Amino acid sequence: MAMRQCAIYGKGGIGKSTTTQNLVAALAEMGKKIMIVGCDPKADSTRLILHAKAQNTIMEMAAEVGSVEDLELEDVLQIGYGNVRCAESGGPEPGVGCAGRGVITAINFLEEEGAYVDDLDFVFYDVLGDVVCGGFAMPIRENKAQEIYIVCSGEMMAMYAANNICKGIVKYAKTGKVRLGGLICNSRNTDREDELIIALAEKIGTQMIHFVPRDNIVQRAEIRRMTVIEYDPNCSQANEYRQLAQKIVANTMKVIPVPCTMDELEELLMEFGIMEEEDTTIIGKTAAEENAA
């Protein structure tokens, strides 16, 4: 099978890295050959696969030796659970330079040094938060990742972020082959969450590829720096990640999304009771003015 390059996006803190690593562990269990490229300065995209606090990043190691040209592939590529190949792009210190540029430099280095071996089935790019700048859009802008999955939940800001990411996909889909593969709902146990994400997916022209229920075993595994698949392979949550993996392997629905307008998104949120209808009579009024009324 041809190598599939997938990028995982979503709001910061939504559980992208945890979901990605559990998905990858499930794919590895199926015998798939995989590489994860962390595209986040936090460098937490591979820690559950490697049982590590944080992998040494390409940008950190380049700074230590002088430049990225002075690095060897074995310096930055580690092998973890299920023979998954792991690399972290990293970025500059907070407040200095552009972390997005680190992503560009790191992926170019991995390509030039032969990290993308011929027998890989999947490459996953775990990307920082929203598409906030051109650097973090690099995996889709440069046609590296052609398949995008957005991790979201039934919370308002997670849905806003998912919609914004769709706008970024549309921009680059016009000039390349990037497509949206679907939404992964990483549940926060909000009311009617699965119905809401299915409705959002339909509105933007895609699918909710899987609903991952909330389960404390995910945190128990994380404390041990392990995926659920490895920590407790027989639990129900491990089977959820296996189902997600199977659905992604079989997925043929790859679309150019149609992002919602802000009004459409707010109407959907009001329909499901996430947002209350706006009362225009209270806008701009102080507490004193409201009490006097």
UniProtKB/Swiss-Prot annotation:
UniProt modification remark: The reversible ADP-ribosylation of Arg-101 inactivates the nitrogenase reductase and regulates nitrogenase activity.
Modified residues (ADP-ribosylarginine): R101
Coiled-coil ranges (or none): none
Keywords, sorted A to Z: 4Fe-4S, ADP-ribosylation, ATP-binding, Iron, Iron-sulfur, Metal-binding, Nitrogen fixation, Nucleotide-binding, Oxidoreductase
Binding residues for [4Fe-4S] cluster: C98, C133
Matching InterPro entries: NifH/chlL_CS (IPR030655), NifH/frxC (IPR000392), Nitrogenase_Fe_NifH (IPR005977), P-loop_NTPase (IPR027417)
Database matches in Gene3D superfamilies: P-loop containing nucleotide triphosphate hydrolases
Entry binding sites for ATP: G10, K11, G12, G13, I14, G15, K16, S17
Cofactor(s) needed by this chain: [4Fe-4S] cluster
EC number: 1.18.6.1
GO biological process assignments: nitrogen fixation
Cofactor note: Binds 1 [4Fe-4S] cluster per dimer.
Residues annotated as signal peptide: none
Reactions that this protein is recorded to catalyse: N2 + 8 reduced [2Fe-2S]-[ferredoxin] + 16 ATP + 16 H2O = H2 + 8 oxidized [2Fe-2S]-[ferredoxin] + 2 NH4(+) + 16 ADP + 16 phosphate + 6 H(+)
Molecular function per GO: 4 iron, 4 sulfur cluster binding; ATP binding; metal ion binding; nitrogenase activity
Highest taxon of source: Bacteria
PANTHER family assigned to the protein according to its UniProt record, in alphabetical order: LIGHT-INDEPENDENT PROTOCHLOROPHYLLIDE REDUCTASE IRON-SULFUR ATP-BINDING PROTEIN
Family, similarity comment: Belongs to the NifH/BchL/ChlL family.
Task of the protein: The key enzymatic reactions in nitrogen fixation are catalyzed by the nitrogenase complex, which has 2 components: the iron protein and the molybdenum-iron protein.
Assembly with partners or alone: Homodimer.
Name the record gives this protein: Nitrogenase iron protein
Record organism: Pectobacterium atrosepticum (strain SCRI 1043 / ATCC BAA-672)
Organism lineage string: Bacteria, Pseudomonadati, Pseudomonadota, Gammaproteobacteria, Enterobacterales
